[in-house]
Amino acid sequence: MFSGIVQGTGKISKIISKKNHITLEISAPKNFNKNLKKGASVSVNGICLTSLDNGKKNLKFDVINETLSKTNIGKARKGSLVNLERSITASTEIGGHLMSGHVHFAGKIEKIITKNTNKDIQIKSQK
């Protein structure tokens, strides 16, 4: 589970295409990977992905075709920036909303309305 509060921005350093998935390598901000364990859940642009290792050098994730078909992560390229969040724990302050990061479908941005320093984004469901 995640709070929905972005904890840092990572940069895609490598994308490896495979038969049924891609592997993403992402450089994360300093200390983001601290105590990360293989199998940990990390939100990448709101998508719950499973860490392939302990992230000592870069974060590494396999992204299956189902996830690629339901999200826009497949449009990311080497050098693209992504939002990152570690999963919450029993002692984590929840300052946002509980989110699973399990994406069911993509929506289309219909309109962006700027009000002072805020933006209202209208999204149309494709379902």
Name each model feature, range by range.
Residues 1-127:
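Conserved loop->alpha-helix
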